[in-house]
Structure formats: structure tokens, C-alpha cells
């Protein structure tokens, strides 16, 4: 039996999948029940105390909702964030039962063992961190015309901040939610905390990371709180089976040198890697010689005296992807430069951004699909299907080192057969923009990048408790949209340093059963 992509709503039956095992969705972990937890001193929906919640009218999987987040209330070892929701208008998409009931608890859940608001995340742009819920309560609630109101609760480890930013699945970012200390519990909060589960996510804030790639495919860069990793494609630097730098190598190495030059000093390791085509000994020797060639050339292109530099080679022993296809072998043929800086970079702006114009030097690469201004939107049709979606992004907001955008996706006549995430995959099937294949990201929005003439900026991400990378974007946008139904897809990108940005979706590199359909949105203003 062959199964197509099915939404979590279709799969969830009492918290179990159609295959008879717990269903894991995207990044958040499998829940584990904790008998007798909470002891009645968690908190939410404070009945008294200072501060008001943050209210927005949002569009979520076709439904119009008025959502009030907060105030968050801290008591003992838990901080509870209430999400009060009022149904303004029903949709006809994947979470609307016969147009009579909207299952908001499925829109905001993040795991398959229970439903509720465990998919909600806390974002601290000043500290460059994200925090997942570490406990969850199964709160199954359907909103109807007769009963349009409910409250769900997201449970976090307490933080010291006076206000917090809450990212709600397919509903947007709620900024400045007040935090109340030692507040009293509402009756709804007490009920929610009577039966809670561990989500198996990290309870502590996790550092945000950024991932960018050169437009020509010659390099990509990952920046974490501790290091900068620049991957250089060996196919650009060297001829096959050679350690002599090509005529094209300097263009790529100069970009790497510019990145290193933004740091005052640190430790730099340069490591060569190969695919598995030749034998181990040959690959190890080749990788070491290639690392030495890159190190020597960098030393002539820029002053490396502030850095402690080492070289090594690992042959085929540390592949970036399985050596099971030509595309993956190409990813594995690389030279990896890792910098552990002594201090932060001297500038947070990108080297190819020209502030004030919204464009770096040179022209953007040719668009592969329809193009329109972000405020006007583009309509994308699926090959061989009647499905169509319209994507609009009117603006992005600058928050610290990041840009926050809320992409509106609207279903065309007849609705869609799959959720928006199926349309927005990166160039690698069932994987992340990094090229890491991960089936848990099949419902995540990972392919949308901000494009400059030289660089693609992919969604910021972070390392989960399981060691995989989770994007700071929608992670379960898998519900179908009815005709005219819209939903909100929030994405957080690294700041490009521009006043206007371009949103771009690349075509898939390989033939897939459900290929994405590329498009481009231009002239998107940056606010804040």
C-alpha cells in the first residue's frame, strides 16, 4: 500500500497514528506522561496581577481567530502561557469538520501523542535563543458557532524576562507578552495542569543558528553561538582527484576571507573531505592535501596573523550526507573551515548587502517561476493538478539580528490537496535547506529564502534535544486549505542588512513525487 502525504488531523485518532505507533511531528519530541505532576501550582490565565495579554486577529488554516496570548504566569517550576481564542469565522480547510467545528488544538500541537498548544515556542531575539515547551497538557477543543471560545495553555520552564515573544503555529508572532510572578491559577489552568506530559524537548533556551548559501552553490555558512563553519565545494576549488586550486577558486576563497576578516581573531581549522569513490587511504591523503592548498591560498589572500590555523583531512569518514547519489557525493566533496572566534564579528550586516537600496552589488539570479511584488502576491499552480496557492508577504520586521515575516497562503478554486509545506520544500527532498535529509521536516516550511545577488538566507534554526536542526518557521503546516481559505506562515530569517528584501523559492534539484513550484516576491519593505 502506498500512502500519499496526509495531514496530522487525518492521522490522529486518540493520539495514535494509522500505523499503530505514536506519530511524531516535525521537531518537537514524543511526549511521556508524568503521573501526579504539577501539584496544582502551575499557572495560567491569572485572575489578578499586572499586565494584559497581547491580542491579534489572525488567519489560521482558513479560520479567522481572535487570539489573546498571556499574561504568562510563573509558579514554582513552570511558566504557563494561556492562549485564549475566539472563532470569528469558520474555514473549510483541513481543520474544519464539515464547516461546523474548527480544531484549534490540532493547529497548535507539536507532537502526535497529545493535542493542545505544545507546538508554541518562545523566542528571545536579544539573547538569540528559542525555547520549546517542556511539558504539555492534552486539551482537545473544537470551536463552533455556538461555542466559539476556548483557552489552551503552553507550558515552559520559567524565564527571568518581564516580557516574552510567543510564536504560535500558523497564527504569527505575539510580541511583548507580559510575565506575572506568583500569580493565581485560573480554573482552566488548574484543570490543564492536572494531567501533563513531558514533551522530551530541552527545557532550557537553545541558541539560534543561521545558515546561508552562495547563489552559485560554491559555499555555505553556518553561524552558531560558538563557531562559524564555512563549507567550500571541492568541485569549484579543484579538478577531479586533484589538490591544485582551479582558476575559479579565488572567487570563492575571497568570499571566505571576507567572512573571516569580520572577526578580530580566533582558532581556524581547515579540514578536507571527499566522497567514497576511491579507497580510504587515497581519499584521506587527497583531503589533507586539499586542506593545505586552501590554507596556503587564504594566507596569501588575507592577513591570517590574528588566527591560529590548523589543517587536516578526514577523507570519506565524515560525510555530510549519505554517499548514495551523485548529488549527495557532491555535497560530501568539500573543504570545511571552522572558526572559533575570540569575539563577535565586528559587523552584523552581510558583506553583499548595500543598505538603503535593498540590493547588493550585481543582479539577482534569474527567477525560475512567477514574480510579483510582495504586497501583490503570486499564484502558483501545481504541475498535473488543479491545485493553486497564492503567496503574499507585505513586509518583514527587523528584530535584533533577524527579520520576521508572516507569509499569507490562500487556497485557489477547489482548495488544495496538500498543506502549504508540501509546496515550500527546499531543493532537497524530505530535508532541510542544509541538505540534511530529515523525514520529520516534511511538514515544515524550510525552503523559503531571502535572496541577494550573492547569498541565500534560509530560515534561522536551532539544534533540538535529538540533535537535528529545527527551523524557526512553521513545522507542521500540513493541513489542506479550502477555496479562498488562508493561513499564516511565520518565518524568521537572518538579517540581510537591507531596507527591502526579496523572497525566493528555488526549484527542486532532483525529480520528486511532489516537486515544489518556484516563485519570487520582490520589493518587500523592512520595518523596525
State where each predicted segment sits.
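Periplasmic peptidoglycan-binding/anchoring modules of Gram-negative envelope and division proteins
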Residues: 214-227, 237-271, 295, 299-300, ...
Amino acid at each position: 500500500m502506498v500512502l500519499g502525504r496526509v495531514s496530522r488531523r487525518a492521522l490522529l485518532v486518540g493520539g495514535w497514528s494509522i500505523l499503530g505507533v505514536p506519530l511524531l511531528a516535525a521537531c518537537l519530541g514524543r511526549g511521556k506522561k508524568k503521573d501526579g505532576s504539577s501539584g496544582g501550582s502551575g499557572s495560567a490565565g491569572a485572575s489578578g496581577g499586572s499586565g494584559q495579554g497581547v491580542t491579534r486577529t489572525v488567519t489560521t488554516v482558513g479560520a479567522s481567530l481572535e487570539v489573546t496570548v498571556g499574561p504568562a504566569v510563573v509558579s514554582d517550576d513552570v511558566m504557563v502561557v494561556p492562549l485564549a481564542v475566539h472563532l470569528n469565522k469558520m474555514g473549510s480547510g483541513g481543520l474544519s469538520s464539515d464547516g461546523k467545528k474548527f480544531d484549534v488544538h490540532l493547529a497548535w500541537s507539536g507532537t502526535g501523542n497529545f493535542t493542545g498548544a505544545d507546538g508554541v515556542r518562545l523566542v528571545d531575539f536579544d539573547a538569540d535563543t528559542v525555547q520549546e515547551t517542556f511539558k504539555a497538557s492534552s486539551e482537545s477543543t473544537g470551536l463552533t458557532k455556538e461555542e466559539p471560545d476556548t483557552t489552551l495553555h503552553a507550558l515552559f520552564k520559567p524565564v527571568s524576562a518581564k516580557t516574552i515573544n510567543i510564536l504560535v503555529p500558523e497564527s504569527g508572532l505575539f510580541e511583548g507578552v507580559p510575565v506575572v510572578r506568583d500569580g493565581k491559577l485560573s480554573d482552566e489552568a488548574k484543570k490543564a495542569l492536572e494531567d501533563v506530559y513531558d514533551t522530551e524537548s530541552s527545557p532550557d533556551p537553545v541558541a539560534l543558528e543561521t545558515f546561508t548559501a552562495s547563489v552559485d552553490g560554491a559555499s555555505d555558512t553556518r553561524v552558531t553561538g560558538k563557531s562559524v563553519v564555512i563549507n567550500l565545494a571541492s568541485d569549484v576549488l579543484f579538478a577531479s582527484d586533484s589538490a591544485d586550486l582551479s582558476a575559479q577558486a579565488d572567487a570563492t576563497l575571497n568570499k571566505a576571507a571576507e567572512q573571516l576578516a569580520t572577526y578580530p581573531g580566533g582558532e581556524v581549522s581547515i579540514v578536507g573531505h571527499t566522497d567514497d569513490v576511491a579507497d580510504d587511504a587515497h581519499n584521506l591523503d587527497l583531503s589533507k592535501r586539499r586542506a593545505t592548498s586552501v590554507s596556503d591560498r587564504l594566507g596569501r589572500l588575507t592577513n591570517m596573523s590574528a588566527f591560529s590555523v590548523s589543517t587536516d583531512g578526514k577523507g570519506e569518514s565524515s560525510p555530510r550526507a549519505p554517499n548514495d547519489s551523485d548529488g549527495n557525493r557532491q555535497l560530501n566533496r568539500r573543504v570545511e573551515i571552522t572558526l572559533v572566534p575570540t569575539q563577535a564579528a565586528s559587523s552584523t550586516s552581510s558583506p553583499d548587502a548595500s543598505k538603503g537600496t535593498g540590493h547588493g552589488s550585481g543582479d539577482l539570479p534569474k527567477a525560475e517561476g512567477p514574480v510579483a511584488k510582495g504586497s501583490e502576491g503570486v499564484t502558483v499552480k501545481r504541475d498535473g493538478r488543479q491545485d493553486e496557492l497564492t503567496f503574499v508577504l507585505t513586509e518583514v520586521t527587523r528584530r535584533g539580528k533577524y527579520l520576521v515575516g508572516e507569509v499569507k497562503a490562500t487556497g485557489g478554486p477547489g482548495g488544495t490537496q496538500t498543506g502549504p509545506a508540501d509546496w515550500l520544500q527546499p531543493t532537497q527532498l524530505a530535508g532541510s535547506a542544509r541538505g540534511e535529509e530529515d523525514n520529520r521536516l516534511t511538514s515544515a516550511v524550510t525552503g523559503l529564502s531571502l535572496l541577494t545577488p550573492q547569498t541565500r538566507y534560509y530560515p534561522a534554526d536551532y539544534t533540538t534535544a535529538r540533535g537535528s536542526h529545527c527551523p524557526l518557521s512553521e513545522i507542521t503546516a500540513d493541513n489542506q486549505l479550502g477555496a479562498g481559505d488562508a493561513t499564516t506562515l511565520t518565518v524568521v530569517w537572518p538579517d540581510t542588512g537591507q531596507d527591502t528584501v526579496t523572497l525566493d523559492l528555488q526549484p527542486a534539484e532532483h525529480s520528486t513525487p511532489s516537486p515544489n513550484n518556484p516563485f519570487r516576491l520582490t520589493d518587500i519593505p523592512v520595518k523596525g
